[in-house]
């Protein structure tokens, strides 16, 4: 297991109370040895004006996962901040749920890189994201 902080899924989900994460309906669903996953509904909260999943909502899911994964790689007195987010959108969605899967690409003392892949309910890739974070403290 790579994580330095040991939180349960319930504890992770409690951090979302009264935030954009909760407003978008993002729920952490799996914490594995080197992976963090979450689901997000594709509905009016996450649609763009033409009824499709908003690219910014996919980016918000990715940054949520990467930032929390980054936080779980810190020690007491440290925090992480996002420095770069890249998203490539592959296919549209209009309803259902998407699942984000976050895994590390690089875990340095001062910076981290995370890959977040967003899948539809059929397991098809909808979006590929990369988040860079800086470790402070």
Swiss-Prot record:
Any one GO MF annotation of this record: 1,4-dihydroxy-2-naphthoyl-CoA thioesterase activity
SUPFAM superfamilies: Thioesterase/thiol ester dehydrase-isomerase
Coiled coil (UniProt feature): none
Active-site residue numbers: 63
Pathway this chain belongs to: Siderophore biosynthesis; enterobactin biosynthesis
Main location: cytoplasm
Family: Belongs to the thioesterase PaaI family.
NCBIfam families in the cross-refs: PRK10254.1, unchar_dom_1
Protein role: Required for optimal enterobactin synthesis. Acts as a proofreading enzyme that prevents EntB misacylation by hydrolyzing the thioester bound existing between EntB and wrongly charged molecules.
UniProt protein name: Proofreading thioesterase EntH
Gene that specifies this protein: entH
């Amino acid at each position: 297991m790579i994580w330095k902080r040991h939180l349960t899924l319930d504890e992770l989900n409690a951090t979302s109370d009264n935030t954009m994460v909760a407003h978008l309906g993002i729920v952490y669903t799996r914490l594995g040895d080197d992976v963090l996953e979450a689901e997000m509904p594709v509905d009016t909260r996450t649609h763009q004006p033409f009824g499709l999943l908003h690219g910014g909502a996919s980016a918000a899911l990715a940054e949520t996962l990467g930032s929390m994964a980054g936080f779980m790689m810190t020690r007491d007195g440290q925090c992480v901040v996002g420095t770069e987010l890249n998203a490539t959108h592959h296919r549209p969605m209009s309803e259902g749920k998407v699942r984000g899967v976050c895994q590390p690409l690089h875990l340095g003392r001062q910076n981290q890189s995370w890959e977040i892949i967003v899948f539809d309910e059929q397991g098809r890739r909808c979006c590929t994201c990369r988040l860079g974070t800086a470790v402070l403290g």
